[in-house]
Amino acid sequence: MKILICEDNQLAAKAMSVVIEREGYDPVTVGDGNKAIEALQKTDFDLAIVDIHMPYHSGLEVVRFLRTELKKQTPVLIVSAFSDPQIQRQAGEMKVSGYITKPFDPADLLRKIRVAVAVV
């Protein structure tokens, strides 16, 4: 399973990538919203994990592009250092599969990945 990780914090991106790779998944990591959009245009991912605050385009802007411009219903998990109810509401309106608060628990991340891809 190919998973896009869109995270500008290199330490968090590496941590997620290691956890995901250990489960046998294929992570692809990008560090900003522009690169996330480019990757989504070029590759059909099974899941995208998108940080809410990134350079160039926010996580919600990336999800909006995925849904409206690319017309894809790829499962998405939003990642944030803050548990913001407004962002969670907006993410829910865009049919986001889940919300992960940093620092993340590896077991919780894997559980949310399994739930997100099982829905498809």
Residue ranges and their predicted role:
Residues 32, 58-62:
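Acidic catalytic/metal-coordinating carboxylates
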Residues 7:
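Conserved acidic carboxylate
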Residues 10-28, 94:
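Two-component/phosphorelay signaling modules centered on CheY-like receiver
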Residues 86, 104-113:
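C-terminal output helix
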Residues 55, 84, 102:
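The feature encodes the CheY-like receiver
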Residues 43-49:
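Active-site beta3 strand of CheY-like receiver
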